[in-house]
Each structure stands twice: as structure tokens, then as C-alpha cells.
A protein has these predicted regions:
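Iron-sulfur cluster-binding electron-transfer modules in prokaryotic oxidoreductases
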Residues: 1-195
Length: 195
């Protein structure tokens, strides 16, 4: 089963004792593994691990890196090759937690460029990034979450981009709910499966 890290429960009910207990259990398992670096795929998890684990006395003994930064570095070092998108014009959805917590904008663009995408920017990108909702919110308030995600698509429609690129599982789940006709949603990690 998937290790509970506390992020989903925190989004649902706040930073309660139950959330902190999940975080402590996760940190203990990571620390016991002896891992030198933890690569975190979901920015929601990365945010809570980076910001809250220390406050709650369950620090990680390892380094923490987002999956986008990790993959971009592998590509830069020539350790990972990607399939070519043949110049499709796309815009990157800057995950709001990566943007606001980690000020991380370049890794997703480096991955996209390596994968052969031509890039344009939506108005709300970088530090102006907007949320597209969360997987937890999609369960308990689906209509609102779909409207929030549709707002990101509206931003894309003001560009000439054919595709929206995301590198976050929660973003992909939410954005997939309202893909406009003629546009494509791309999980950027899917570009990593072939040369």
C-alpha cells in the first residue's frame, strides 16, 4: 500500500495530531532506510515534508528533492533520454506548491525542452501560478475543483499552445477533468518512457 505521508489528510482536515502521526511514521521509515536523498513526485508531499516535518520533530535525515528537479538533472547529465515531441507548442502548468514553496519553475521547462516541446507561457505562470485544485478536493467538492481546473485551461486558451504540460500527479488528475476540445493534457513524465 502507498505510504501515508500526511499531505492528503492535512488538505482534508488541517495539521492535526493524526496528520503529524502519519508524518512521523513516514519520516521514521525513510530514516530507517538509510536513503541519502528522497525524490518526491507529488509537490503536496514535498511541501509538507519540507515545511512541517521539522516543526513536528520528525526531520528527515536525508536530503529532499522534487521529482522535476531530479529528472531535469538526470537529463542535463546525460543519464536519461526522452522521446521527441517534434516541436509541439505547449505551455507548462506551474504547480502552485512548487512555485510558491520551492520557487521551482525551470526544471519542468528543461524537461519539456529536452522532450522537444516548443514553449510559450500562460499569463499565470511562475510566481503568478494558480492552483488547478487537488485530488482530495476533487473528491469532496468536484464541481468547484473542476471550475478551478477550467480556469487554468482558460489561461492556456489565451495562448496558441496545443498542449498543457504538467509534472504533478494531482495537477494531472484535476486538469484531466476539463480538457477543452482540440487541446491535449500531457503528463510530462510520460515523455521519459522512450527515446
Amino acid at each position: 500500500s502507498r505510504m501515508k505521508r500526511g499531505a492528503a489528510l492535512a488538505d482534508l482536515m488541517g495539521y492535526t495530531a493524526e496528520v503529524q502521526a502519519q508524518a512521523r511514521k513516514c519520516a521514521d521509515a525513510i530514516n530507517a532506510s538509510g536513503a541519502k536523498t528522497v525524490v518526491v513526485l507529488d509537490s503536496y508531499d514535498a511541501e509538507i515534508m519540507a515545511q512541517k516535518y521539522g516543526e513536528w520533530g520528525c526531520e528527515l535525515s536525508s536530503g529532499l528533492v522534487t521529482a522535476t528537479a531530479f529528472v531535469a538533472k538526470l537529463i542535463e547529465d546525460g543519464l536519461l533520454t526522452v522521446r521527441n515531441a517534434n516541436g509541439i507548442l505547449a505551455a507548462c502548468h506551474d504547480d502552485d506548491r512548487l512555485a510558491r514553496t520551492f520557487h521551482e519553475f525551470e526544471p519542468i521547462r528543461a524537461i519539456a525542452k529536452a522532450a522537444g516541446y516548443e514553449l510559450t507561457e500562460m499569463f499565470n505562470h511562475g510566481k503568478l501560478a494558480k492552483s488547478c485544485g487537488s485530488a482530495v478536493a476533487l473528491v469532496y467538492m468536484p464541481e468547484i475543483t473542476k471550475k478551478v481546473a477550467a480556469g487554468r485551461w482558460d489561461d492556456l486558451l489565451r495562448t496558441e499552445a496545443a498542449a498543457m504540460l504538467t509534472a504533478n500527479p494531482e495537477s494531472y488528475i484535476c486538469l484531466a477533468e476539463s480538457v477543452p476540445e482540440g487541446k491535449v493534457l500531457v503528463d510530462l513524465y510520460s515523455a521519459l518512457d522512450k527515446e
